[in-house]
Amino acid sequence: MAYDRRLVIDTILYVLRTGTAWRHVPHDLVPWDVAYRWFRCWSTDGTWNRVHDLLRDLVRVAEGRDPQPSAAVLDSQTAHSHEGGEAIGWDAGKRTRGRKRHILVDTSGLLLKAVVHAASVQERAGAKLVLAGITATFPLLGLVWADAGYVNRVDQGLLAWAREHAGIELQIVPRNADVKGFQVLPRRWVVERTFSWLGRCRRLARDYERKPAHAEAMIKVAMIRLMAARLAGEDIEPQGPIETEAARRLNDELSQE
């Protein structure tokens, strides 16, 4: 590598955090094509995945938890796509053209798996992409919480599929019908907070990637940035009243496990 590897990573993080186009990278960083080439290389050979998974295990151990989670939370987010590319679709419910980010997180919000697919793919089909083979990676995982968008009174087939094919007990967290508008649902708020972490990286505010694999890699890089800072004792997250309340809720729920 002709350029310092740390500077290459700094350039990739600059693109992630600021949302700038690769070609607009400042001249005091490495040339944009060099940074993009290494980002693409590390996406293809699984480097981002390996680094991410190692850091996640270290964070869980540092928090006094087993590296292998036993429960998780599932959710999706539709991201508008400005560019063309692979796997672009129309989400009729959100009236958005782009891709869906399906993520599975542990009970503290750390990413376990991310799958990016066309926004036209329904929630139940997207959930199967995430849960298929998940226990091969996380053998202790037995319970997954999700919202009511994954099942309805007519079609509850995903619950049976999860038990039969994934060995997972999928538990739906219902909304309170008496409350209108936004609700903070037990367990479910954890994955929403993870989406908010990702949203602080402007590259992830929308989907700018041409390939779903690169979109998944950007999610991993965002979590790598977050977890590396956490292990180093650095605070890169805003600490307002919302974050303080979220931390209190998390501590309460973890103490009950």
Language-model segments: which ranges?
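Short alpha-helical elements
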Residues: M1-E257
